[in-house]
């Protein structure tokens, strides 16, 4: 397939458009590639994974959000099925740290069944038997990342995220899916409270420091990235459909005002989240296809700070080379 490559010098401050040359100065590392397709289908999901050129070896975890009861925006079994089958993967999730139908193991398994993931796939609720701690490089707020004990059962992770808004983080993509998503219920509270509590009810005492929460997400995402880099590896995919201002953890999300855009994939989690943000922020609104509500949600929560901090601590690059696999 013929591919067109573009350099995207990613800067939300200037909302710069993609363009330029893929060459860097002598001695500089090449920019990470972010692959893009405008087609959202089971076939294109497999194709964009294959474009990454990485073989999933060993026991493969496919990290998705199973979606809160009542939510219809989560990535559906029929969409992800071909990729999961190709990988021989197991869908992995953890319990939540808020009231709903996924904060207990019993209720979460029922939601998993109701949303069609069982019996279609092997599914592992990674913290149903407890938590374990993995190290983080950035200990400014959190001192470790508390994840489900079953994470140790996997050698390779496909971080398959639904890109959309989020009531607390501003937006959710692969960084959130790696941090809050992989954290156990106690670990979620620990990240939300920027290292102050493991309690689901107590975490709300600490929501006043938004940047500390966002920085804790970046640190936890780096912990998960490092964990799998030391094993067989990790890849990152963002699906840009049903882009409500609300997350899949919301049982009654707002209707999307922005039309579906496509799928992005990369080996660099910072680059792929930044590429999605750039696409949203550079979108030109038309009737029935308006980015304003999603941008307001992101900016009102300072959501881009998660990406900024992730880049600052060395998790990845906000500059990237965009590769359109449709061309």
Set out the residue ranges of the language-model regions.
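Positively charged n-region of N-terminal signal peptides that target proteins for export
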Residues: 1-4, 276
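Sec-dependent N-terminal signal peptides
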Residues: 4-13
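C-terminal motif of bacterial Sec signal peptides marking the signal peptidase cleavage site
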Residues: 15-17
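Bacterial lipoprotein signal-peptidase II cleavage site
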Residues: 19-26
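Extended, low-polarity segments enriched in aliphatic/aromatic residues
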Residues: 27-81, 86-327
């Amino acid at each position: 397939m013929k591919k067109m490559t573009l350099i995207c010098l990613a800067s939300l401050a200037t909302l710069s458009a993609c363009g330029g040359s893929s060459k860097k100065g002598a001695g500089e590392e090449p920019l990470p590639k972010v692959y893009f397709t405008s087609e959202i289908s089971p076939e294109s999901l497999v194709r964009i994974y294959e474009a990454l050129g990485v073989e999933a070896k060993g026991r493969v975890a496919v990290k998705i959000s199973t979606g809160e009861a009542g939510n219809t925006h989560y990535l559906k079994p029929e969409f992800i099925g071909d990729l999961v089958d190709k990988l021989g993967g197991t869908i992995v999730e953890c319990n939540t740290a808020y009231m709903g139908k996924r904060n207990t193991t019993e209720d979460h398994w029922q939601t998993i069944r109701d949303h069609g993931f069982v019996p279609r796939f092997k599914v592992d609720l990674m913290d149903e038997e407890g938590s374990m701690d993995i190290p983080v490089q950035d200990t400014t707020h959190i001192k470790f990342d508390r994840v489900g004990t079953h994470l140790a059962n996997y050698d390779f992770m496909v971080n398959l995220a639904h890109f959309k808004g989020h009531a607390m983080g501003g937006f959710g993509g692969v960084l959130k899916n790696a941090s809050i998503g992989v954290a156990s219920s106690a670990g979620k509270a620990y990240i939300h409270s920027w290292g102050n509590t493991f309690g689901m009810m107590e975490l709300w005492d600490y929501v006043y420091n938004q940047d500390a929460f966002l920085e804790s997400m970046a640190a936890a995402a780096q912990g998960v990235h490092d964990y799998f880099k030391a094993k067989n590896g990790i890849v990152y995919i963002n699906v840009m459909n049903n882009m409500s201002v609300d997350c899949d953890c919301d049982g009654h999300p707002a209707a999307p005002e922005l039309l579906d855009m496509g799928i992005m994939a990369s080996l660099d989690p910072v680059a792929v989240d930044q590429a999605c943000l750039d696409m949203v922020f550079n979108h030109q609104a038309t009737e029935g296809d308006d980015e304003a509500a999603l941008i307001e949600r992101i900016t009102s929560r300072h959501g881009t700070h998660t990406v900024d901090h992730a880049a600052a601590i060395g998790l990845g690059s906000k500059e990237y080379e965009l590769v359109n696999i449709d061309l």
